[in-house]
Amino acid sequence: NQNQLTEIPVNYYENLLQLDLFLRKITSKEAGRKLEEAVKLILEARYIIFIGVGSSGALAEYGARYFTNIGLESYAISDPYQAVKGKGAPDVLSIVLSASGETDKIIERVVKLREEAPAKIISITNHPETTLSKLSNINLTYGFQTEYSAYDPLENLTSQLPVIAFIEILAHQAMEKADKCN
């Protein structure tokens, strides 16, 4: 029968199994509380700055576009040397994306933001015990197995699907909560 779906073997792409586990984990009470805290910061912000470099920079662009499309004023910074509008303002939220949580230019940017004022920072990283996660008000983590390119061993190929999931979940929860308040 041509209409039957074929099942993809688990060993076809290991990250599919990891994604399934991640999606189950984010429905837990603990994850729910963290997401609620993040949504509260999002709704308190005058505007949101997504920050990332490399693949995380592309996802920062996606996050800013997605949030803007639901009515949350957002900008993306994928160049670590770009100036930040209203930096250090207490009503500006930075959502910082970094799979490793250790990218030098990202850490430098976050340290500067924290020195200038009580910056509010949500980070999305692959692991919870990173420099970036420790500098953040809230850290959302996905815990995938780190994967590097055989072509260029310095290139991180860890799946970024959870980052997209976090961005979309946060946006939708913020939109729903804002609608209830209005």
For the regions a protein language model found, what residue spans apply to each?
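HTH-adjacent hinge/linker in prokaryotic transcriptional regulators
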Residues: N1-K34
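Short helix-loop capping/hinge segments that flank enzyme active sites or metal/cofactor-binding pockets
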Residues: L5, E176-N182
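Residues that form generic nucleotide/phosphate-binding pockets
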Residues: F22-I26, L41, Q173
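Glycine-rich phosphate/diphosphate-binding loops that line cofactor/substrate pockets in enzymes
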Residues: R33-A45
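Secondary-structure transition/capping residues
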Residues: K34, I49, C181-N182
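Glycine-rich phosphate-binding loops that contact phosphosugars or nucleotide phosphates
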Residues: L43-A178
